[in-house]
Amino acid sequence: MGEGDAFWAPSVLPHSTLSTLSHHPQPQFGRRMESKVSEGGLNVTLTIRLLMHGKEVGSIIGKKGETVKKMREESGARINISEGNCPERIVTITGPTDAIFKAFAMIAYKFEEDIINSMSNSPATSKPPVTLRLVVPASQCGSLIGKGGSKIKEIRESTGAQVQVAGDMLPNSTERAVTISGTPDAIIQCVKQICVVMLESPPKGATIPYRPKPASTPVIFAGGQAYTIQGQYAIPHPDQLTKLHQLAMQQTPFPPLGQTNPAFPGEKLPLHSSEEAQNLMGQSSGLDASPPASTHELTIPNDLIGCIIGRQGTKINEIRQMSGAQIKIANATEGSSERQITITGTPANISLAQYLINARLTSEVTGMGTL
């Protein structure tokens, strides 16, 4: 293996060169790899991604960034932290194996120090373990677990660390969380063994990396503009919600009271005209009291309900988050070819949810692909 070969583990980017490892005889290569990794002498560059909460990230960064600066300088690893408006953050550590393990040691010991400090003001007598969460491509988790759980059992027994591989993938990704708990020394040994497994078993296909979503902030609509509430002020919302809301009001207006929607004959319409909905949205002030919640019902053919729900509920959850409406899908009724959807919220919430549902249906019926 030549100098400068770059490997991404355990979180491996799609363009990695890990596939070159598959040409080596596996058992002999594995022993040689494990020995070199343990000694910190394997000449590869690793990228390991950690999932941390805000408090943990704050501990790593330190006052004015002094702690993370010290970790970078003393370990020789590159340590990058994802943007700060998310409850969860991704900490990416890149470098040669010895630099990676030094960085991990510093992080683990820093967390242990935090635990000891927190216990000084607590009646607890037993010290809780240090816990780190790695982000690993789901296609590599099988190798990490091993046949019948043999590999993960071996790692637990040889390092003394507790290792748990999440059963579900992280949202909107093909990665899983691997939680490691124990003493700092046990965690370091565990990470070394996990790196060996990841290097021996490259990910299959492209990996969709997990990207934590920003913390949700209240959104209100006024005068066709979306605003987020920050403290006592309403700040214009910068993303696409405003455009979506405008589209919703233009393309799926509330028909006059008593009329049905020609696109969905069984649909019961809300008791608001388009003009009334606009008035209720608070044209005069961005901080007017929210309009009263109303309920909107529609029926969808059974053969189209899947495109609304999405795999494991991903699409309906997206529609809920983007619209701010409560959306309930009734269970299938025997003998019925349709399912009822109930949307509850303000007229603006309902209108946006209806637009997004109609867009999904149009996409499915016309074969335009997923939105």
From Swiss-Prot:
GO terms for molecular function: C-rich single-stranded DNA binding; mRNA binding; RNA binding. Disulfide bonds: none annotated. Residues 45-95, 129-182, 293-357 form the KH domain. It is found in: Cytoplasm. GO terms for cellular component: cytoplasm; cytosol; extracellular exosome; nucleus; ribonucleoprotein complex. Keywords: Cytoplasm, DNA-binding, Repeat, Ribonucleoprotein, RNA-binding. GO terms for biological process: mRNA metabolic process; negative regulation of transcription by RNA polymerase II; regulation of transcription by RNA polymerase II. The keyword RNA-binding applies. The keyword Ribonucleoprotein applies. Its main location: cytoplasm. SUPFAM superfamilies: Eukaryotic type KH-domain (KH-domain type I). It comes from the Eukaryota. InterPro entries: KH_dom, KH_dom_type_1, KH_dom_type_1_sf. Single-stranded nucleic acid binding protein that binds preferentially to oligo dC. This is Poly(rC)-binding protein 3. The gene is PCBP3.
